Amino acid sequence: MKYFNVGKIVNTQGLRGEVRVLSVTDFADERFKKGSQLALFDKKDHFAMTVEIASHRKHKNFDIVKFKGLYHINDVEKYRDFTLKVTEDHLADLEDGEFYYHEIIGLDVYENDILIGQVKEILQPGANDVWVVKRKGKKDLLLPYIPSVILKVDVPNGRIDVTVLEGLDDEN
């Protein structure tokens, strides 16, 4: 079974068993809603247990989560630095033109039907995501996720068609 990160427990919150979660999901309200089931993985990325969400609220830059059956700080302290994950069958449905990062990373990138590399990472520096393309014998290419650059994404065929605008490739 495949699991995908939704957040990391970075600390406890108060004495009543709440934890601070640094979320890495665009669907925090859905992932952390009461009754949701998440997998808890330890610091070495080994499955530890399944937890059920008892409550969720936002506080500053964190999601404050309480798990069913864990009602005291002593019950949750040991889970600091553990990761919360969701199974693939619980991923939210996306709109047309939206993708999960795991679907994009590893795809081949083409310009004018010439293979230029593979997506190795996706950065979120601001208004637009930036796709990092690993190229053989050249520096990585940074492509903003905008319509004038990313022309077509074909996940089933493992292909992305792009136009590298002037100034994006400093090796030309």
Curated annotation (Swiss-Prot):
Residues 96-168 form the PRC barrel domain. One of its GO terms (biological process) is ribosomal small subunit biogenesis. InterPro entries: PRC-brl_dom, PRC_barrel-like_sf, RimM, RimM_N, RimM_N_sf, Transl_B-barrel_sf. Keywords: Chaperone, Cytoplasm, Ribosome biogenesis, rRNA processing. It is found in: Cytoplasm. Disulfide bonds: none annotated. GO terms for cellular component: cytoplasm; ribosome. The keyword Chaperone applies. The PRC barrel domain binds ribosomal protein uS19. Binds ribosomal protein uS19. An accessory protein needed during the final step in the assembly of 30S ribosomal subunit, possibly for assembly of the head region. Essential for efficient processing of 16S rRNA. May be needed both before and after RbfA during the maturation of 16S rRNA. It has affinity for free ribosomal 30S subunits but not for 70S ribosomes. Belongs to the RimM family. This is Ribosome maturation factor RimM. It comes from Streptococcus mutans serotype c (strain ATCC 700610 / UA159). The gene is rimM.
